[in-house]
């Protein structure tokens, strides 16, 4: 067995070399990353060896992985030539994108600027699904973004909303989510309305403050240009010329979802986000998000965009955590099924 293993390693057909030359020394340094961090990420993820020689790279490894590494490096360099600053996270995203679809063009995704945040950070899609989501929001009046935590569903929707507000395409932004932990009543909590509502809407405020500086956000909220409110407060209203975002939609009941969708007035757009695997409703209660998908998936003018763990845009461990939990849940479900038999 040991001899067989050695034979595979030394087989000239088992490895391939690629040589890449780069003309701009400054861009080449940016391509490598600080302390060659970008190269280290590529080596670890693709299991190839990359050597730096002057302003060139030598890649060695499995033929398919070597070609993939070369393609990723060429496209990252192309982004740098366009003035896009490549960070380690971008290398991770590039690996995921091109591993899933070798025909993908990083420039089509990463250079699609949505908004420049309060911290002067350019907000762009970071996966094929995120790009499809942004394109859907631009094109359709009602868009559902469904998938696990960390895929950028709410954050990108808010970036689009703020960008459209700043262009005067809408007169206000409305951010809402069901306060399921309080049964949408909020009556037993201490304090005035703002204090009661705040814990359930804090994630929306956090994302808002990442895009608009604190003082400006406060003024927009005070004027009613940006409204952050629990879903129950949407009842009986007609929302005209508004960009409306419903977050945590998996925790709506079918009645609440229908109520929300029928609030939409002239010149308005709605984005509904949620994770159908994270429902916190009481046992036996149907999810409005699941019902909406079943009822509306064929309706013209409504778009559903699905995300997976491959689209997770948080710390790289978040994707590993999601995958591990899903694997464990599947194992438990299989074991329970076997025991019933």
Residue ranges and their predicted role:
Residues 51-110:
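Interdomain "pre-motor" coupling segment immediately N-terminal to P-loop NTPase/helicase cores
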Residues 10-30:
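Short glycine-/aliphatic-rich beta-strand segments at the starts of folded cytosolic domains
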Residues 40, 46-49, 55:
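Compact, well-ordered interaction domains used in eukaryotic information-processing assemblies
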Residues 104-125, 130-131:
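P-loop NTP-binding catalytic core
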Residues 22-24, 52-54, 61, 177, ...:
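Flexible glycine-/small-residue-rich
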Residues 27-44:
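Short amphipathic alpha-helix segments
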Residues 118-128, 136-246, 250-341:
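Conserved helicase motor core of SF1/SF2 NTP-dependent helicases
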């Amino acid at each position: 067995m040991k001899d067989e293993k050695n034979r595979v390693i030394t087989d000239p057909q088992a490895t391939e070399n690629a040589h890449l030359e780069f003309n701009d020394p400054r861009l080449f340094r940016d391509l490598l990353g600080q302390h060659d961090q970008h190269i280290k990420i590529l080596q670890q993820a693709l299991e190839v060896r990359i050597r730096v020689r002057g302003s060139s790279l030598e890649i060695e490894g499995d033929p398919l992985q070597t070609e993939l590494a070369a393609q990723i490096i060429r496209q990252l360099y192309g982004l740098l030539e366009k003035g896009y600053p490549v960070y380690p996270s971008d290398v991770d995203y590039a690996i995921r994108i091109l591993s899933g679809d070798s025909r993908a063009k990083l420039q089509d995704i990463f250079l699609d600027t949505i908004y420049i945040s309060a911290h002067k950070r350019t907000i762009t899609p970071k996966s094929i699904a995120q790009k499809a989501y942004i394109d859907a929001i631009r094109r359709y009046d009602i868009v559902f973004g469904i998938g696990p935590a960390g895929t950028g569903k709410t954050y990108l929707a808010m970036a689009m909303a703020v960008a459209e507000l700043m262009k005067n395409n809408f007169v206000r932004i409305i951010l809402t989510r069901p306060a399921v932990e309080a049964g949408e009543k909020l009556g037993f909590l201490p304090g005035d309305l703002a204090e009661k509502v705040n814990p359930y809407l804090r994630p929306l405020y956090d994302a808002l403050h990442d895009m608009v500086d604190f003082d400006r956000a406060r003024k927009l909220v005070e004027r009613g240009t940006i409204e952050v409110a629990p879903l129950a407060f949407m009842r009986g209203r007609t929302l005209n010329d508004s960009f409306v975002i419903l977050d945590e939609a998996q925790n709506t009941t079918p009645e609440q979802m229908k109520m929300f969708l029928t609030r939409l007035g002239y010149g308005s757009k709605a984005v509904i986000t949620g994770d159908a695997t994270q429902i916190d409703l009481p046992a036996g209660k149907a999810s409005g998000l699941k019902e909406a998908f079943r009822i509306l998936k064929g309706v013209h003018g409504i778009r559903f965009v699905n995300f997976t763990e491959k689209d997770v845009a948080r710390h790289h461990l978040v994707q590993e955590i999601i995958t591990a939990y899903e694997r464990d849940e599947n194992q438990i479900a299989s074991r329970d099924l076997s025991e019933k038999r």
